[in-house]
């Protein structure tokens, strides 16, 4: 977190001695818990994912941790849909050209396309993945495939067609959208190997956690035209 000031928070917590801490993306460290003192009973996370809270430290101190899964799922799904549109229409490039006075840029664009009939591939088919699938399938007429080791086809109906492996998502999709939590197993689990599986015309969307992706390898994949576009709602740092 660019704005995280642990020392400042520690001083405030020492003064306040709170019974509860509410956070969103700010890290909650063991030192901060100790600064709050024995009054601290609960830490609340606004949203899903607990990777910014030291769960082991909270458990050791008998501090309850609660969160709100699904609280912002619709917003994240809509953001992912926007990023798909931005990639398909080369939104950032066209915007920069217009702002510089190049109003004829549209006549030279050859790699923009519609979403209808394209394939969206989901890595993770939880709440956000299913909401994005609904937008893509019902709103844009896209085909939707997905990989999720914790779900079976009957749980998804005809909304998402599950494939046998994550690799198949990367191979088949025109848009790969990442919706997985950050865990020791998923950290940097997406890199050049996965990007090289993708179609050279495909786009990569990440609206989950930045650290799941090896960012240096994503930049390299873009620079070497391994994939066409990346739409990022999150970054590593």
Label the predicted regions.
Residues 40, 116-119, 192, 201:
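Phosphate-coordination loops involved in phosphoryl transfer and adenosine-cofactor binding
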Residues 14, 30, 149-237:
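Rossmann-like adenosine-cofactor binding region
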Residues 125-126:
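Glycine-rich Rossmann-fold phosphate-binding loop(s) that bind the pyrophosphate
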Residues 1-66, 191:
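An N-terminal-biased, well-structured beta-alpha scaffold segment characteristic
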Residues 2, 46-50, 70-73, 150, ...:
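Short, acidic/turn-prone active-site loops that include or flank metal/cofactor-
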Residues 69-119, 131-139:
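Phosphate-binding beta-alpha-beta segment of Rossmann-like dinucleotide-binding domains, i.e.
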